[in-house]
Amino acid sequence: MARLGHRVTIYNRGGKHVSGAGFDSSDMAETKKTGFYRGVRVRKVPTIDHKGMAAVSSSFTSAIITAFRRFDVVHIHAEGPAFMCVLPKLLGKRVIVTIHGLDWQRAKWGGFASWYIRTGERQAAKHADQIIVLSRGVQQYFMDTYGRETVFIPNGVNRPEKVEAKLITEQYGLKTNDYVLYLGRIVPEKGLRYLIHAWNRIHTDKKLVIAGGSSDTDAFLEELRKEAGDSVIFTGFIQGRMLAELYSNAYIYTLPSDLEGMPLSLLEAMSFGNCCLTSDITECTDVVGDHAESFRKSDVDDLRFHLQKLLDNPDLVKKYKQEAADFICRKYNWDEIVLKTLDLYRRPPRH
């Protein structure tokens, strides 16, 4: 949007990086100096940097700021922040809400947090001029629950450059096709317990790499570590070159989730030309079509079967790899997605 000449401002929570200050990238360091990232203005808002309060406080202050600034459109992402969507709406702003998933269903949220997030969902259904959803399943949910029409505009992905294994070899002893990769947040709904239980029954000399940071779920991460065998590597949060190397050199990428919005990591994995194995939830199968393997959600035995099948059939893995990148980059093109979003911004407000 910025390249097309639009003035875009992002309001981001203050405080440290979710995985620690050491994970601030060089790009983010430059953004702190200039206030811009690739032509987009970035502003941090006052935030109570405490477990359970960061998202609530930052979305509240963002809503107040955007309500009183001279913006044509206020675009809110996720159900929790949508709790405040009525504020900019009352002051004449056109309000768009993107629903990334039914976040109140996530296992990590307790009573108040789940109520707050679901109330945000209801506020979006009532007050937003337009609602964007990332999956057909969520689109149907909004129609069935609220009688509210939404617009399906999925995430996009760009074709990356694959890179050779270097850092992952130095740090973890990993080589090309030497491991199965999971990359995402370490939270219960991602199906990681099923994955580890299935992996413990697999016959292979490959490693299982679980890459990603916990999100207020440190106790869950420790439980997984205790259940995992010696062939499982936990990297913690990763980014930059290390991230690209893990995607570029995996034998299989797997996403065993019980619950998703639209899994951006799955798009990224396919854009790197990975053979993917996902659970059969609609949010995953709609993305991959017949260009990946799937197993029955929550079924450890079926997950183990498909993992072993792919580990024992390198020709099948090669076939999936050869078609993945072309398929996904055509299907989820960022340029087309930006134009669809801009068209939505131009629609008249809802009264």
Q: Model segments located where?
A:
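N-terminal strand-loop element at the rim of the active site
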Residues: 2-50, 137-143, 216
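Membrane-proximal helix-turn-helix segments that form the acceptor-binding/catalytic region
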Residues: 64-67, 90, 114-131
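Nucleotide-activated donor-binding/catalytic signature segment of Leloir-type glycosyltransferases, i.e.
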Residues: 221-241
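Short hydrophobic beta-strand element within catalytic cores of glycosyltransferases
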Residues: 275-278
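Short alpha-helical donor nucleotide-sugar binding micro-motif in glycosyltransferases
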Residues: 237-238, 245-250
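Conserved acidic donor-binding segment of nucleotide-sugar-dependent glycosyltransferases
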Residues: 293-301, 309-315
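A conserved mid-protein helix/loop that constitutes part of the nucleotide-sugar donor-binding site
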Residues: 178, 182, 187-201
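Aromatic "clamp/platform" in nucleotide-sugar-dependent glycosyltransferases that forms part
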Residues: 256-258
